Amino acid sequence: MKIALLNDTHFGARNDSNIFDEYFYKFYDNVFFPYLKENNIKTLIHLGDIVDRRKFINYKIAHNFKHKFMDRLWQEKIDTHILIGNHDIYYRNTNKVNAVKSLCTAPDGENEPFIYEDPKVVEFDGLNILMMPWINPENESHCLEMLNTANADVCMGHFDLNGFRMMDAMVQKHGYDKSIVSRFEKTYSGHFHHKNDDGQVFYLGSQYEMTWSDYNNQKGFHVFDTETREVEFIKNPYTIFKKLVYDDTDKNYDKFDITDYNQKFIKLVVANKRDHQMFDRLLDRLYNEISVHELKIIEDYSDLSHTNVSDDVAEGSEDTITLVNDYVDQLPVDLDKDKLKIMIKEMYIEAQDTEVKD
């Protein structure tokens, strides 16, 4: 039996951006649903975070979600199982008030998706799988008990485990220890958007790009085989972020093909700019010959030297969070620096979801 796996779909991402909504459905319309139909896959497990914002979703995004995603699952007669993720819940201490129960309904009112607010063992073609939703203060004891006693070799959930990559160069240092799932042959999880697989725990990664931290990180969905207990990765060919390094020392940008930059968020990194007129002509082409969602030009790094961060820290840092964490470590203050780092990280992630102009 083949089971399609989705996770961290985050419908309504980037403040209900229409740009990202259209980009998401390119994947569903051209990759996901056609693959399920061609391969006669009739079961879907969603491993949490089906929507993006915990408090609300706008009418247009909700309309598209119902008619272009949920109704299509029903029309294709896909047996759908949805785990509650942390972005799906209104309160942080319970899964009971969630977007899934409100939005994920079937047109006939009968063949509703299976929704998991609490852990449950479900049999798929003779294979028992423990379905583990987001663990919160209300269900924690029950979840941990099920992780220790459930009659299942495979676990699928929405876990916050330490030691795994949340995004590029950012490793989770908090959360539950991996040992809580050590008794399972394999654990598949949503929550972190970058693929992580240590051989026993597999964070599947998101299906598409949502922030610049997803850039150059292969996206797609997975198909689980209950007989072999292996997963197959189906690539999503669509991207929305693209970088262009400008160096006119040995390249003529008047002849540069900009087709691949259409309908993209672009970072234009200026390495060497000797011909200012050619650079301006390139900008003119990017703005007028194609449709660019956003163009950021990066060419002045002088402001970095004016910070209080030492040169060795700045040179050794791989990303924004690493830079900030190293800076916090150098602060001569009597504070809980680990707690401060967590607060900064949460603010950084929230800032990445700032509104995108449609």
Question: What does each model-found stretch correspond to?
Answer:
Residues 1-4:
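Extreme N-terminal starter segment of soluble prokaryotic enzymes
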Residues 8, 44, 49, 65, ...:
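Divalent metal-coordination and catalytic microenvironments
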Residues 9, 13-120, 180-184:
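Core catalytic region of metal-dependent phosphoesterases/phosphodiesterases
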Residues 10-14, 52-55, 82-93, 122, ...:
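Active-site environment of divalent metal-dependent phosphoester hydrolases
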Residues 73-76, 146-150, 178-183, 259-261:
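Short, conserved loop/helix-junction motifs that constitute active-site signature segments
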Residues 167-233:
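Conserved beta-sheet core of the metallophosphoesterase superfamily
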Residues 226-358:
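Accessory, non-catalytic peripheral segments of nucleic-acid enzymes
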